[in-house]
């Protein structure tokens, strides 16, 4: 299963990158170069420097550094667990795997670095004229921005839109973050149990 998903994701990313290149090649180059705006370089400590450092940065690695440990963890975990053809959710280990998956899922959709990349790419493919250097004012932790970003891929990059639409569900993040879920291994379901609602998610090997 994971090999099929990997191929689908690769095709979707290739489609989005091709669209971005043809829509606004300048912004796409800045996107690939990790163009960002660092407000710290506007500080008074730089006032007497000549020339002053520019807050417009290329190869901005701070976001990558902040996200590096999580990135390495979930890639190692997925490769270790799901590349085996005989993988199954069974017993306590199966429940442990599901809990770790929900944690990884929550972290991905709460990752500011990941969402910044997705947001910038969505603006490029949807035809925004200028590159989004400074996105510091946006609230990245929340459902509205993710849904807004997803919709910008709908026409230009249908493959990526389909993947985001199928993979992002706000209640999974809420279930894990607020401990509002229960795994029923026999029925092969995860129940999200909130005060006013109950949602069932089916899982399979």
Region locations from a protein language model:
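Flexible secondary-structure boundary motifs
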Residues: 100-170
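Amphipathic, Lys/Arg-enriched alpha-helical patches that create a basic surface
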Residues: 188-205
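Extended intrinsically disordered or low-complexity regions, especially N/C-terminal cytosolic tails and loops
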Residues: 1-101, 167-168
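Phosphate-binding glycine-rich loops and adjacent basic patches that engage nucleotide phosphates
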Residues: 75-80, 132-138, 171-182
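Short, charged/polar, low-complexity loop and linker segments
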Residues: 87-92, 147-158, 196-198
């Amino acid at each position: 299963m994971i090999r099929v998903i990997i191929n689908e994701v690769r095709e979707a990313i290739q489609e989005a990158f091709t669209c971005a290149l043809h829509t606004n090649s300048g912004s796409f180059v800045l996107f690939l170069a990790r163009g960002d705006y660092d407000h710290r370089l506007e500080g008074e400590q730089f006032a007497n420097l000549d020339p002053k450092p520019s807050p417009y940065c290329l190869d901005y690695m701070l976001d990558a550094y902040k996200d590096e440990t999580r990135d390495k963890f979930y890639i190692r975990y997925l490769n270790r667990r799901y590349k085996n053809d005989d993988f199954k959710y069974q017993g306590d280990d199966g429940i442990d795997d599901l809990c770790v998956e929900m944690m990884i899922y929550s972290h991905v959709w709460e990752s500011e670095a990941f969402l910044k990349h997705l947001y910038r790419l969505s603006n490029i493919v949807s035809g925004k004229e200028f590159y989004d250097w400074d996105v510091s004012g946006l609230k990245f932790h929340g459902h509205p921005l993710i849904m807004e970003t997803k919709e910008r891929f709908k026409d230009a990059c249908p493959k990526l839109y389909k993947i985001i639409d199928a993979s992002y569900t706000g209640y999974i993040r809420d279930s894990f973050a607020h401990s509002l879920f229960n795994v029923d291994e026999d029925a092969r379901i995860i129940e999200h149990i909130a005060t006013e609602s109950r949602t069932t998610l089916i899982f399979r090997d």
